[in-house]
């Protein structure tokens, strides 16, 4: 059995695309975790979508044996964390399970926004940090400039920063030695009563729910009776194991170690991330501090294009939620789109990945409505309603005021793009709180309503700065806003799937653009179709789709048939009026996608 002072638990943190998973692969290979034949790029990225996009979505863990230069054997527990802002919750959970972090910075790019966010999370968790400068094999690598940036922007000493290359393997041995020297061993007592932190859980077809744990005190072993402190439920442990990175069974996990257990649980919601697991016969007086559960911040409707695929979509969402408890869904019905689901996500990339997985893994054609955020509607009577769907907004006369979520945004950009970025932030109702410089890069801090960045703020930043700017945000609470519900009516019928919350100042512009877009995208019918944008009962924009005109007078010749002509024209007029009254206007899928694009262009 390994002594606790020979264990090192650490997370790998970095901005997206700075080489975390590649360096993790190199460390695994260097410690003999996998043979040359078993190695594949991004070993710890288990989903196909992770490898294709080159991003980490779920935090992955691996236990390695390492013989250091001092001749002693050590156990290294690595957690490879996601780098994208949407998955920062995965990062925070992982950091709680470790004592130290390796901070990877791309030496060709320098410090980026997500680097800052993740480092601050690590420092808040009181981590020791080892800075690593990756991609030194590239001609554009600038070590001194990157070191200076780390010291100026983050405030970490870079005297012992390790230059390395995930591609060639240079510097990997130095990283391993630095981990042993600089990072602390875990604290904990093997002989104390059991206390475990539930770090993560996921569903396995054969084993049921697999629980990733970090043993704080005591030991956890097979056939032991354990208790979840938040639910008071008791279970018998069926399996104990570690990832090497292959799942390997062990007899027990001791204080300081990270591994997995299975207990035959079939429902993921019974395992709350951050919960304390203890010995059912000796429960402790108080639980571990744990951490805040993730809350969805972006909501949208998902509808099957073919209504017969509704059950397939329901089953698909249920299966995805088994492995991703951070997104929520509930049934929703729309007069325009039929039956579907209202889903909540951690951010736009999260939304994109869930919809892509549904389409790919379950072969469902999906229609996604405009993404929105959660508003707090304060009613005249004093109660507060959390609004996810604009079509459910109560009557304006019953509302006192509406609050919308705001974020604190950090943008790091080369200084030549500063003017363009400030203009975009101002257009998005942003309030600048800070501006600082490090060399030729600017660090901007803005407070912006989340609804303004939810569509494509990141994409616009990337396109106007040729991909050099990076963006990160955290939610700072709700603030009162002058918001109205913009309703869209087609042939005097409200289309709930197209309604949206907008700021009063932009309502007319957005309404006009939506009407113009729908006029182009809805096919003509035999009768005239009005397309209107409205706030409450007031119409603020209108376009008209002209009906087809049939010449009913072609067969009538001569000048004496005036009465006959009048009768035919009146009959046609009545038919058109009846068509307008009872005719159903089919709104094609392209119209919904077109409106979504308008929101992106705003």
From Swiss-Prot:
<dbReference type="GO" id="GO:0005525">
    <property type="term" value="F:GTP binding"/>
</dbReference>
<dbReference type="InterPro" id="IPR000640">
    <property type="entry name" value="EFG_V-like"/>
</dbReference>
<dbReference type="InterPro" id="IPR038363">
    <property type="entry name" value="LepA_C_sf"/>
</dbReference>
<keyword id="KW-0997">Cell inner membrane</keyword>
<dbReference type="InterPro" id="IPR035654">
    <property type="entry name" value="LepA_IV"/>
</dbReference>
<dbReference type="GO" id="GO:0043022">
    <property type="term" value="F:ribosome binding"/>
</dbReference>
<dbReference type="InterPro" id="IPR009000">
    <property type="entry name" value="Transl_B-barrel_sf"/>
</dbReference>
<dbReference type="GO" id="GO:0003924">
    <property type="term" value="F:GTPase activity"/>
</dbReference>
<dbReference type="InterPro" id="IPR005225">
    <property type="entry name" value="Small_GTP-bd"/>
</dbReference>
<dbReference type="GO" id="GO:0097216">
    <property type="term" value="F:guanosine tetraphosphate binding"/>
</dbReference>
<dbReference type="GO" id="GO:0005886">
    <property type="term" value="C:plasma membrane"/>
</dbReference>
<dbReference type="InterPro" id="IPR035647">
    <property type="entry name" value="EFG_III/V"/>
</dbReference>
<dbReference type="Pfam" id="PF03144">
    <property type="entry name" value="GTP_EFTU_D2"/>
</dbReference>
<keyword id="KW-0342">GTP-binding</keyword>
<dbReference type="InterPro" id="IPR000795">
    <property type="entry name" value="T_Tr_GTP-bd_dom"/>
</dbReference>
<protein>
    <recommendedName>
        <fullName>Elongation factor 4</fullName>
        <ecNumber>3.6.5.n1</ecNumber>
    </recommendedName>
</protein>
<dbReference type="InterPro" id="IPR031157">
    <property type="entry name" value="G_TR_CS"/>
</dbReference>
<keyword id="KW-1003">Cell membrane</keyword>
<dbReference type="Pfam" id="PF00009">
    <property type="entry name" value="GTP_EFTU"/>
</dbReference>
<feature type="binding site">
    <location>
        <begin position="134"/>
        <end position="137"/>
    </location>
    <ligand>
        <name>GTP</name>
    </ligand>
</feature>
<comment type="function">
    <text>Required for accurate and efficient protein synthesis under certain stress conditions. May act as a fidelity factor of the translation reaction, by catalyzing a one-codon backward translocation of tRNAs on improperly translocated ribosomes. Back-translocation proceeds from a post-translocation (POST) complex to a pre-translocation (PRE) complex, thus giving elongation factor G a second chance to translocate the tRNAs correctly. Binds to ribosomes in a GTP-dependent manner.</text>
</comment>
<dbReference type="InterPro" id="IPR006297">
    <property type="entry name" value="EF-4"/>
</dbReference>
<keyword id="KW-0648">Protein biosynthesis</keyword>
<dbReference type="InterPro" id="IPR027417">
    <property type="entry name" value="P-loop_NTPase"/>
</dbReference>
<dbReference type="Pfam" id="PF06421">
    <property type="entry name" value="LepA_C"/>
</dbReference>
<keyword id="KW-0472">Membrane</keyword>
<dbReference type="InterPro" id="IPR013842">
    <property type="entry name" value="LepA_CTD"/>
</dbReference>
<dbReference type="Pfam" id="PF14492">
    <property type="entry name" value="EFG_III"/>
</dbReference>
<dbReference type="InterPro" id="IPR041095">
    <property type="entry name" value="EFG_II"/>
</dbReference>
<keyword id="KW-0547">Nucleotide-binding</keyword>
<comment type="similarity">
    <text>Belongs to the TRAFAC class translation factor GTPase superfamily. Classic translation factor GTPase family. LepA subfamily.</text>
</comment>
<feature type="domain" description="tr-type G">
    <location>
        <begin position="5"/>
        <end position="187"/>
    </location>
</feature>
<dbReference type="GO" id="GO:0003746">
    <property type="term" value="F:translation elongation factor activity"/>
</dbReference>
<feature type="binding site">
    <location>
        <begin position="17"/>
        <end position="22"/>
    </location>
    <ligand>
        <name>GTP</name>
    </ligand>
</feature>
<dbReference type="InterPro" id="IPR004161">
    <property type="entry name" value="EFTu-like_2"/>
</dbReference>
<keyword id="KW-0378">Hydrolase</keyword>
<dbReference type="Pfam" id="PF00679">
    <property type="entry name" value="EFG_C"/>
</dbReference>
<dbReference type="GO" id="GO:0045727">
    <property type="term" value="P:positive regulation of translation"/>
</dbReference>
């Amino acid at each position: 059995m390994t002594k606790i002072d020979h264990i090192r638990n650490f997370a790998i943190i970095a901005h997206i695309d700075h080489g975390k998973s590649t360096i993790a692969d190199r460390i695994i290979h260097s410690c003999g975790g996998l043979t040359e034949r078993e190695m594949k790029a991004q070993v710890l990225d288990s989903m196909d979508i992770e490898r294709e996009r080159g991003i980490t979505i779920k935090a992955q863990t691996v236990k390695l044996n390492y013989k250091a230069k001092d001749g002693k054997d050590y156990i290294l527990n690595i957690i490879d964390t996601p780098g994208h802002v949407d998955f920062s919750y995965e990062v925070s959970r992982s950091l709680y399970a470790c004592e130290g972090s390796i901070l990877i910075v791309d030496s060709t790019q320098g410090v980026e926004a997500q680097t800052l966010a993740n480092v601050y999370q690590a420092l808040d968790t009181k981590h020791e940090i080892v800075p690593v400068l990756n991609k030194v094999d590239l001609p554009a690598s600038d070590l001194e400039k990157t070191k200076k940036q780390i010291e100026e922007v983050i405030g970490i000493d870079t005297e012992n920063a390790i230059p390395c290359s995930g591609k060639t393997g240079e510097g990997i041995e130095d990283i391993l030695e630095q981990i042993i020297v600089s990072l602390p061993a875990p604290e904990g007592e093997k002989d104390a009563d059991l206390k475990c932190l539930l770090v993560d859980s996921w569903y396995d077809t054969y084993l049921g729910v697999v629980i990733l744990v970090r043993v704080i005190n005591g030991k956890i072993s097979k056939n032991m009776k354990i208790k979840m402190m938040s639910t008071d439920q008791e279970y018998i442990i069926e399996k104990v194991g570690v990832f090497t990175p292959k799942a390997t069974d062990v007899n027990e996990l001791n204080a300081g170690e990270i591994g997995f257990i299975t207990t035959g649980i079939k429902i993921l919601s019974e395992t709350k991330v951050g919960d304390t697991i203890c010995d059912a016969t000796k429960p402790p007086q108080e639980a571990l501090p744990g951490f805040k559960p993730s809350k969805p911040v972006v909501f949208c409707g998902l509808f099957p294009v073919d209504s017969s695929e509704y059950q397939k979509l329901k089953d698909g969402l249920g299966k995805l939620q088994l492995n991703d408890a951070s997104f929520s869904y509930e049934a929703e019905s729309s007069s325009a789109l039929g039956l579907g689901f209202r889903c909540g996500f951690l951010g736009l990339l999260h939304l994109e990945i869930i919809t892509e997985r549904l389409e790919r893994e379950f072969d469902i054609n999906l229609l996604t409505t405009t993404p929105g955020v959660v508003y707090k509607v304060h009613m005249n009577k004093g109660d507060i309603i959390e609004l996810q769907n604009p079509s459910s907004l109560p009557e304006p006369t019953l509302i006192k005021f509406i609050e919308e979520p705001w974020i604190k945004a950090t943008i790091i950009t080369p200084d030549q793009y500063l003017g363009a970025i400030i203009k975009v932030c101002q257009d998005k109702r942003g309030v600048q709180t800070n501006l600082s410089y490090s060399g030729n890069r600017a660090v901007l801090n803005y407070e912006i309503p989340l609804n303004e960045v939810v569509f494509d703020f990141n994409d616009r930043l990337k396109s106007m700065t040729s991909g050099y700017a990076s963006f990160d945000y955290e939610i700072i609470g709700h603030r009162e806003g002058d918001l109205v519900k913009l309703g869209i009516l087609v042939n005097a019928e409200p289309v709930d799937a197209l309604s949206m919350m907008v700021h009063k100042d932009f309502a007319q512009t957005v309404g006009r653009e939506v009407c113009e877009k729908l006029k182009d995208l809805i096919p003509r019918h035999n009768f005239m179709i009005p397309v209107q944008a409205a706030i409450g009962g007031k119409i603020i924009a209108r376009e008209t789709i002209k009906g087809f005109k049939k010449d009913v007078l072609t067969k009538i010749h001569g000048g004496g048939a005036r009465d006959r002509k009048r009768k035919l024209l009146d009959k046609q007029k009545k038919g058109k009026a009846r068509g307008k009254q009872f005719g159903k206007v089919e709104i094609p899928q392209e119209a919904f996608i077109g409106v979504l694009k308008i929101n992106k262009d705003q």
